[in-house]
Regions:
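A domain-level signal for the structural core that forms small-molecule/cofactor-binding pockets
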Residues: 278
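Active/ligand-binding-proximal structured segments within catalytic/core domains
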Residues: 44, 51-102, 288-300, 308-312
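Histidine-centered active-site/metal-ligand motif
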Residues: 80, 84, 228, 275
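Internal nucleotide-binding/catalytic subdomain
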Residues: 258-262
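Short loop/turn motifs at secondary-structure junctions and domain boundaries
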Residues: 29-31
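Charge-rich, well-structured scaffold segments of protease-associated domains
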Residues: 1-22, 34, 40, 51, ...
């Protein structure tokens, strides 16, 4: 018996140990070969895989549904500190064992703390998939979290904070986040502050680990030379399937609202340029207008051919770097323009940026620009799917954000369906600089 819902096909014969294996990407008849498979295990672990023909490697990752967005002001940076601390040793591996485990096999191991998730990722030859699953399983489930290691790792993170503060085009984004989101966790620094990092203790790390690092809050994804049943067997042998579901009490996150338009300046006389971020609330991940937003954002500041690059750099020569940025989250987004210019030309450069943005916000894009933008976005989407790591991340986001998995053809159809009315709508709503928060850093303020 086969039950079909949209582009998801579940076949009773595919059930393993009472757990349905879902093939995503097939048509309703099941005739098309699926490109992604998903299994939700009884202990709450979500497992996704995508076999990539011709690949000889596998990207394997685990995402924890806990990060900066779920922290209190007093514990700002605890998610990032825990991500560091798991590498200091586990029940089976020393810190050196972890460092050598995959690199000596020609692979790589890394971790990232983001606003909504913390991820642990590996890239290995296909024959070493089990090694990757074992090592990341140890990091996620069995860290030692020792007091002596914490004292050392605090010093490392304080150095990381200093490095960011010494890099103007890094620190200005932290300043802008605080200006845009205020006291909401969206405005927190992922690294934390010096005071919060110094105050965090082992009890804080153990409490976060106990609450969040369990199968019920985990998504595992793999892409490359991997079969779904093979991945499930590897996870079973590595002990992932025997772990208890864990505490599923939701994290309390207050609704977010962006600050109104205003300007802030951080005086820095020790740098030679004024760094500027002009930005505001962006589009949420699940907003169906996301692709129209992407086209406007890309044509405004997405490359050498963009309106801002051509105007500010090529025509006026006022900046070396000028570009747009965009981050989408489950509940909101953040986007804007970054540029850096000499103190005596920074205001002129900012005025030019505003002029271009006003034009886009008022008029949207011409039909020729929209056609070119669609063509460019289609190309970027396809190119982004060439690597197994990017495909792994795309697979994980289907579970993390509750998004349907879309084949390349389906994505191309969504891009092609973007119309001028939707473009004008998102341009008016999101790209008017008069609604944005302005932050500058350098010897001289702009307004």
């Amino acid at each position: 018996m086969t039950a079909s819902v949209a582009n998801v096909v579940v076949t009773a014969a595919d059930a393993v140990d009472g757990t349905a294996v879902v093939a995503i990407g097939a048509d309703a008849s099941g005739a098309a070969a699926p490109t992604l498979q998903r299994t939700d295990l009884p202990n709450g672990l979500t497992v996704l895989s995508e076999h990539v023909p011709g690949a000889r490697s596998v990207a394997f990752g685990a995402w924890v549904r806990a990060a900066t967005l779920h922290e209190s002001a007093e514990q700002m940076g605890v998610s990032h500190l825990l991500e560091h601390m798991v590498f200091k040793g586990t029940r089976s591996f020393s810190a050196q064992d972890i460092a050598l485990s995959l690199e000596t096999l020609g692979g790589s191991l890394d971790a990232y703390t983001e606003r909504e998730h913390t991820s642990y990722q590996a890239r290995v030859l296909d024959e070493h998939l089990a090694d990757a699953a074992t090592v990341i399983g140890e990091l996620v489930f069995e860290p030692m979290l020792r007091l002596d290691d914490l004292a050392l790792e605090r010093k490392v993170i304080l150095e990381e904070i200093s490095m960011v503060e010494d890099t103007p085009d890094d620190i200005i984004f932290d300043v802008h986040n605080r200006a845009l989101w205020g006291d909401h966790p969206h405005g927190y620094a992922i690294l934390g502050t010096r005071d919060t990092v110094r105050a965090l203790d082992v009890d804080d790390l153990q409490a976060l680990h106990a609450r969040a690092y369990h199968p019920g809050r985990l998504v595992v994804a793999a892409s490359g030379r991997v079969e779904h049943e093979q991945l499930l067997e590897v996870l079973d042998r590595a002990g992932w399937t025997q772990r208890p579901r864990g505490d599923m009490t939701p994290f309390a996150v207050d609704p977010v609202e962006a600050a109104g338009a205003h300007a802030e300046h951080v005086l820095r006389r020790d740098i030679g340029q004024t760094h500027i971020v002009l930005g505001g609330q962006g589009i949420a991940y699940g907003d169906p207008r996301r692709f129209a937003f992407a086209v406007v954002d890309m044509l405004l500041g997405g490359g050498m051919s963009s309106k801002l690059f051509q105007r500010v750099r090529e025509e006026l020569g006022l900046a070396y770097s000028v570009s747009t940025f965009n981050s989408s989250f489950a509940d909101t987004g953040a986007h804007g323009v970054y540029l850096a210019s000499a103190p005596d030309t920074a205001q002129e450069a900012l005025d030019a940026v505003r002029e271009v943005m006003h034009e886009v916000a008022a008029n949207g894009l011409t039909s020729e620009e929209l056609a070119a933008g669609k063509r460019q976005l289609r190309g970027q989407l396809v190119l982004s799917m060439e690597g197994v790591s990017s495909r792994m991340y795309r697979a994980a986001t289907t579970a993390l954000y509750g998004e349907p998995f879309r084949t390349v053809d389906q994505l191309m159809a969504l891009v092609e369906a973007i119309d001028e009315d939707t473009v004008r709508e998102v341009a008016r709503e999101y790209f008017n600089p008069d609604r944005h928060v302005l932050v500058s850093l350098g010897p001289q303020a702009v307004r």
